[in-house]
Amino acid sequence: MSEEKPKEGVKTENDHINLKVAGQDGSVVQFKIKRHTPLSKLMKAYCDRQGLSMRQIRFRFDGQPINETDTPAQLEMEDEDTIDVFQQQTGGVC
């Protein structure tokens, strides 16, 4: 017999969440991440996969900028939610 100890402070909902990251070019990359993992992990993985620099792009959820320290739980993200990626706009005069 194996003893299974109930985890304290853990909700009955799944600890992982599936998120989609949608680029401006129409590409969609899916990630599975823990609800309490900082989104910087997902952001860096997306940049590595797409060959981009973190300085080149911005991530937004529901129109709001995402900070690297934010977690899916803090932003009340649900399974299959989409994060939008935008190229960093550099100011200039035409």
Swiss-Prot record:
Record cross-link Glycyl lysine isopeptide (Gly-Lys) (interchain with K-? in acceptor proteins), residues: G92
Coiled-coil blocks: none
Record-listed cross-link Glycyl lysine isopeptide (Lys-Gly) (interchain with G-Cter in SUMO), residues: K11
Superkingdom of the source species: Eukaryota
InterPro entries: Rad60/SUMO-like_dom, Ubiquitin-like_dom, Ubiquitin-like_domsf
Keyword Cytoplasm: yes
Domain Ubiquitin-like: 15-92
GO terms assigned for molecular function: protein tag activity; ubiquitin-like protein ligase binding
PROSITE patterns: UBIQUITIN_2
Compartments it resides in: Cytoplasm; Nucleus, PML body
Xref: Gene3D superfamilies: Phosphatidylinositol 3-kinase Catalytic Subunit, Chain A, domain 1
SUPFAM superfamilies, per the entry: Ubiquitin-like
Main location as per UniProt: cytoplasm
Record PTM text: Polymeric chains can be formed through Lys-11 cross-linking.
Residue numbers covered by the propeptide annotation in the UniProt entry: 93-94
One of the record's GO cellular component terms: cytoplasm
BP GO annotations: protein sumoylation
Assigned keywords, A-Z: Cytoplasm, Isopeptide bond, Nucleus, Ubl conjugation, Ubl conjugation pathway
Family of the protein in this entry: Belongs to the ubiquitin family. SUMO subfamily.
Function: Ubiquitin-like protein which can be covalently attached to target lysines either as a monomer or as a lysine-linked polymer. Does not seem to be involved in protein degradation and may function as an antagonist of ubiquitin in the degradation process. Plays a role in a number of cellular processes such as nuclear transport, DNA replication and repair, mitosis and signal transduction. Covalent attachment to its substrates requires prior activation by the E1 complex sae1-sae2 and linkage to the E2 enzyme ube2i.
Quaternary data: Interacts with sae2 and ube2i. Covalently attached to a number of proteins.
PANTHER family attached to this UniProt entry: SMALL UBIQUITIN-RELATED MODIFIER
Protein name as catalogued: Small ubiquitin-related modifier 3
Organism expressing this protein natively: Xenopus laevis
